From Swiss-Prot:
Pathway where this protein functions: Carbohydrate acid metabolism; D-glucarate degradation; 2,5-dioxopentanoate from D-glucarate: step 2/2
Enzyme Commission code(s) on record: 4.2.1.41
GO biological process: D-glucarate catabolic process
Organism superkingdom: Bacteria
Record's catalysed reaction(s): 5-dehydro-4-deoxy-D-glucarate + H(+) = 2,5-dioxopentanoate + CO2 + H2O
Record protein name field: Probable 5-dehydro-4-deoxyglucarate dehydratase 2
Length: 331
């Protein structure tokens, strides 16, 4: 992965009337998917030696699709985008496009440095992805003009619609939100900060039709609060290992079954967050471990992430059993 420099002058294809039409169609598909189900962020499968296990990824993604998600986001944070080289990324996104076969939108991850973001955007476009989630950069702080400028430049280099992601060092001001919403091809914002005061200001400032997503860690915890400020759609890490639990929560929330929502939060989601917070990186490591406990061929995480300790794995096993029992008992 290269330094954050713009060395490729032919990284994209620009925008135009055909792009505008395609973007509108993707937005409508995303909007429909958001209303229908949770957003799936599949894991990327690896062999024990750390190499890509594409067959394992395909098998895992099939279980995700069978649960009826609103959209699929391969090679994003949960999919360990940070660790994938260009060829691995191409294989993962291509497999996701082939398996979904148009059933739901495929939104591939890209981001970090400018040159890397542009190259991966081209790969995703060539693979047939529907849109891109622009993951935050790291290590360097950037002013608002820089955050907006990165999206402007990326939008010039790809026909794919872009969803900005604010998390970590990336936080958009209200004025920046207005600016990025005017960029052709930028269609939405995923929020991982959980600053609901700021988020409410952003949703009020956005033009009609601009998409917002709850991207908080274990988003179900704050799903009701996000919905109250106009952001009901959310990503679900739990869906990656227990779509039954994620689906039951989503249905209870959608249908206004407050007692069922609170029971799942109290007995499964809150303990899961407490377990997740024990060790940095468990936001991915625990999810993969839980998927392995269910017989999914997802393999280990890649460094610098580490797999859960024996004690934490035992707690995860017990908690997973509790969650599945809750769903099996119809809450």
């Amino acid at each position: 992965m290269s330094a954050d420099t713009d060395t490729d002058t032919d990284t994209g294809t620009g925008t135009g009337p055909d792009t505008d039409t395609g973007t509108a169609a993707v937005v409508e598909r995303l909007r429909g998917g958001m209303a229908r189900g949770v957003l799936s962020f599949p894991l990327t499968s690896f062999h024990d030696d750390g190499s890509l296990d594409l067959d394992g990824f395909r098998a895992h993604l099939e279980t995700q699709l069978a649960a009826g998600p609103g959209a699929v986001f391969p090679a994003c944070g949960t999919g360990e985008f940070f660790s994938l080289d260009e060829d691995e990324y191409r294989q993962v996104v291509t497999a996701a496009v082939e398996l979904t076969a148009g059933r739901v939108p495929v939104v591939a991850g890209t981001g970090y440095g400018w040159a890397q973001a542009a190259r991966f955007a081209r790969i995703a476009e060539d693979a047939g992805a529907d849109a891109l989630l622009v993951l935050p950069h790291y290590l360097v702080a950037a002013p608002q003009d820089g955050l907006v400028g990165q999206l402007e430049r990326l939008a010039e280099r790809t026909r794919l619609p872009l969803i900005a992601y604010q998390r970590g060092q990336v936080t958009y001001s209200v004025e920046s939100l207005r600016r990025i919403a005017r960029i052709p091809g930028v269609v939405g914002l995923k929020d991982g900060h959980s600053d609901l005061d700021r988020l409410q200001r952003l949703t009020l400032a956005a033009p009609e039709g601009f998409l917002f997503f709850n991207g908080a860690a274990t988003a179900e915890i704050q799903a009701r609060a996000y919905a109250a400020v106009g952001v009901p759609a959310y990503s679900s890490a739990v869906h990656a290992f227990a779509p039954e639990i994620a689906g039951a929560f989503h249905a209870a929330l959608r249908d206004g079954h407050g007692k069922a929502v609170e029971k799942l939060l109290r007995e499964f989601y809150v303990p899961f967050v407490e377990l997740r917070d024990r060790v940095p990186g468990y936001g991915v490591s625990l999810v993969k471990a839980a998927a392995r406990l269910r017989g999914r061929p997802v393999g280990p995480v890649r460094a610098p992430l580490t797999d859960p300790s024996a004690a934490d794995l035992a707690d995860l096993t017990s908690l997973l059993s509790t969650g599945l029992d809750l769903v099996g008992a119809a809450l």
